[in-house]
Amino acid sequence: MRQIYSFIILIILISNALLSDNGELYDSRHSTLINLNPMNFNTQITNNRNKEIISFIHFYSPDDGKSNQLKDVFIELDNEYSGMFKLAGLNCKKYKDLCAKEGVTEYPTYKIYPPLPAPPMKYEGKIETKYIISYLRKFVGNKVQELNNNNFDEFIHDKPEIPKILLFTNKKSIPLIFMRLSLEFDVSIYLFNIILFHRKKSILVL
C-alpha cells in the first residue's frame, strides 16, 4: 500500500513539473490577469478596442529566462490598476502562431493595444510600474472638464437632474480613475475637475 501511495505521489509531482514547464506564467484563478489563447484573443483584446479599453500584453515563453523575474511587476500592475487597464499574458511556447501573427518573435515582448484607430505598439520602456503607467496614461481618453470662475455657475445650473462629481485637488494632472470614470459615465453623470493649487489635500465630493 505504501508503495502504491508513493507511486501516486511521484506521478503527481511529475505531472506538475510537466505542466509548469509548458504552463501559464500567470494564475488567473487568483487575479484578473487574463491568459490569452487563439480562442479568446479577439474577444478579450481585439473587440474591446472599440470600447475605449487599453490592453497591455506580456508575450512570453516559460523558458525565456526573464519573464519569471518580471512577472511580479505585471501582477502588481493588475492589483493596483485592475479595471482601468486590461492586463494579459500570452504563452508563445504554446501559441507560437498567434504570437507570430501579432508580430512577436522574441520573448519577452510587451505590447500595448490602445483604443482604435491607434495601432498596437511595442512597449520598450522599463518594466517598472511607474514607467508603464506613465506610458499607458497617454492613451486614456478624458472627458473631464476643468471648472473656473467663468463657468462654475453654468455647471451648477446646467441639467440639474444629472448627478455631478467634483474633484478638488492640488495636483496638475487628473487622476487616472477620474479619467476612466469620465468615459464610463459620459452620458449619465457629469465629471468636473476643479484644480486648487493652494490646497494640501485632495478631496473627492460626491
Predicted segments — roles?
Residues 194-195, 203-206:
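Cationic, amphipathic, low-complexity alpha-helical segments enriched
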Residues 4, 15-56, 80-163, 169, ...:
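N-terminal leader/targeting and pre-domain segments
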